[in-house]
Amino acid sequence: MAEHSAPVLEIDPKYGPFDKHTPMMQQYLRLKSGHPNTLVFYRMGDFYELFFEDAEKASRLLDITLTARGSSNGHPIRMAGIPFHAAEQYLAKLVKLGESVAICEQIGDPATAKGPVERKVVRVVTPGTLTDAALLSDKINNHLLAIAHLPAKRGAAPLIGLAWLNLVGGELRVMECSPDQLDRELERIRPAEVLADDATLNTIQVDVARTRLPDWHFDVEAGTRRLREQLGVASLVAFGAETLTAALAAAGALLNYAAATQGQSLRHVIGLTVEHESEFIGLDTATRRNLELTETLRGQESPTLFSLLDTCATSMGSRLLRHWLHHPLRDRAIPQARQQAIEVLLGGDWQTLRSTLRTLSDVERITGRLALLSARPRDLSSLRDTLARLPEIREELPQSDAAPLLIELYAALTLPEDAHALLQRAVMAEPAAMVRDGGVIARGYDADLDELRDISENCGQFLVDLEARERERTGIANLRVEYNRVHGFYIEVTNGQAAKVPDDYRRRQTLKNAERYITPELKAFEDKALSAQDRALSREKLLYEELLQKLLPHLAEFKRIAAALAQADVLATLAERAHALSWSRPTLTDAPGIELTRARHPVVEQQVEQFVANDCMLQEARKLLLITGPNMGGKSTFMRQTALVVLLAYVGAFVPAEAAVIGPIDRIFTRIGAADDLAGGRSTFMVEMTEAAAILHRATPNSLVLMDEIGRGTSTFDGLALAWAIARHLLSHNRSHTLFATHYFELTQLPQEFAQAANVHLSAVEHGDGIVFLHAVQEGPASQSYGLQVAQLAGVPQPVIRAARKRLAWLEQHSADTGATPQLDLFALAADMPIVDEGDADAETPDSALADALAGIDPDDMTPREALDALYRLKALASPAA
């Protein structure tokens, strides 16, 4: 991703002597000096122009034409441009590439300017400070995050302070963590842009746009003052942030940077949330990836848990749902309150509520743009129309003492009558997209504007009347009175009628077949009409700016409403999903353990015709389940579904199970799948061991651990030894709730040593040479792994299968004769094994050829003649010497 540094105000010497440049280029270079590492969009008429190296870079990134026009300081000026009305699509592409763009607008009047028109940078668009709807994803929050790294003092450990802001939503959060937790927190927050000093940025492993700030930006005292000023308080004690020195340093740098990019204060940032790791069920990077919460293992958006659940009626709801899925809570009170609300909604008319919610606009983001004075006319009309629906939504929210959360939402959705009345009076029913086009302020809101509009809008009738009078006065029947933008108002007379033109007509334009004239009366009207139109647009722009200012005192009300609407939407959506998918309300309890009855994998269930539900029992006396069975038998699905049921329960949703009783959970760990990290220089086995080490160091008795085939990335001896030792450690030291899938059948002896371990297996049955997976979890270990049958299903060539079958038969016979375990003695016995190549396997016995021939016969699809021929072939195979 692109990296940027903070602005430094000096003219780059590479541009040559400053006084050798033209006045316009001097103006550009002054502006560019404030943004040396940022692309500058320099407004010139209807285009944004880029110059010098900015033009070259933009030409390459945007695939636009690079030209050279004129010269400055004796050299051609390289330039590239984009139409101002198409700027958003180009900005979107640049931001996606991690670039930042300074928007430089004309703020002076070209008609009165002496020299270059006055210009200034009105805002800087960076990946983390997007506010335009066209640049933002509807369903993902866009976070700007700052990192402050405070060195260790007096033997204390060094501290990392994090502060992150959803700029358009106005949500500011802070926390502190240790350096080794930094990447994990960045994976959780998923910022669009990170601010930090050089040393800190060099330690980050996460792929994200980075902006380098000097160390002095991260000052604790300055950060504390800046945050108090932003929140309008004398102390941060009430927020629980007064002692979080590293977080305060990060918050100060964050707020200053965000305000600088917007060119104004952040009026809507009026609250602060302090997060602590202990609030949430811990989900590390591997767990978020393996559970496919919002992204599949292949990096796709679907099918995931989020894509299954997100039938939200509003974008606000979708963003909140995504946040909830990544932040399951340890405290049972909030999830239980959500589940109570869902249960009450299911007993009411949640369908009507969802239908009404679908008509609403994105109040959260409109509020952010309003606070930044960048709200457009249709933002205001959408806000007005959404506010008008609040009484209806309140009526549709069921009220019950059994669901206090719904009562809170009802109160939060009170209509702000003053703000709504103002919007109703001020904004047209269907305003223009941009205020510069006019047609935004409603008639009756301002008498002066109405008068100017009347003059402008009555032009049509005046022209009709004038045309009729002039035809009668001159006797020219085809005389026309018209208007165009270039020549204004005129009277057009064809050349054949030129002799009838009166003396008071003054020629304005000559055409091939006609002449255009102006009269004193028409000129006077033109001056009045065009002046009225211009003055009306100016008046409307002024009124619109005043309207934005009048709405600012209502920001807190709008934010409250947006938060309540988002919650109502998510709860109604989870009710709809529970109804549609036959999910049940879980029971969250103090007693340790996980008891799931007929649980299903929420996503996989939707991808198959028939899903086999399974129970899962983890208690104090049954801490670890050793799961054996064939590949494709469902071991990984069983483990993942258990974790997803637990996660959904602590999100506050209903769960895909007939019943679920779940005790306290502090973290969910997963070690599933095989993947290397070539860029990081780590093999598959190294990745596996790194993840296993993290689990062994951090898992507690209240953690849920999923271990899938640990140790498979090395030799049999090493892998089995490690798997055995890891399972023992989880039982004796971590004592976590553990699902441990393995193909090492030797591990099934573990319950003989530890009473808290139990064997379960995924069942399968052989059918001829094939295998049928039953996907049912049963007590006890599996009898075999069915590896050859799975290989056959995968399409491994028959000669390879036959060779493997012969080698397996020898291993099993040797094991029976010596009492050795095939897995343990695999390498020790290598020298004693018979050598069987594929050619030997192909010709090994008539029985194998006969079996292959029989497998290829479909008796139901043969004629009598074909059946007789097949019988002769089989007889020949059975007695080849005949």
From Swiss-Prot:
Query: Which UniProt keyword terms apply here?
Result: ATP-binding, DNA damage, DNA repair, DNA-binding, Nucleotide-binding
What GO MF annotations does this protein's record show? ATP binding; ATP-dependent DNA damage sensor activity; damaged DNA binding; mismatched DNA binding
**SUPFAM superfamilies, alphabetized:** DNA repair protein MutS, domain I, DNA repair protein MutS, domain II, DNA repair protein MutS, domain III, P-loop containing nucleoside triphosphate hydrolases
- For the keyword DNA-binding, the answer is yes
Listed under GO biological process in this entry are: mismatch repair
Quote the SMART domains the UniProt record gives. Answer: MUTSac, MUTSd
Record-listed ATP binding positions: 629-636
Q: Name one GO cellular component term.
A: cytosol
Top-rank taxon of the source lineage equals: Bacteria
List the Pfam families: MutS_I (PF01624), MutS_II (PF05188), MutS_III (PF05192), MutS_IV (PF05190), MutS_V (PF00488)
Give TM regions.
none
Family annotation (NCBIfam families): mutS1, PRK05399.1
- HAMAP family in UniProt: MutS
* Similarity annotation: Belongs to the DNA mismatch repair MutS family.
The entry's function note states: This protein is involved in the repair of mismatches in DNA. It is possible that it carries out the mismatch recognition step. This protein has a weak ATPase activity.
Q: What name goes with this protein? A: DNA mismatch repair protein MutS
Organism name: Ralstonia pickettii (strain 12J)
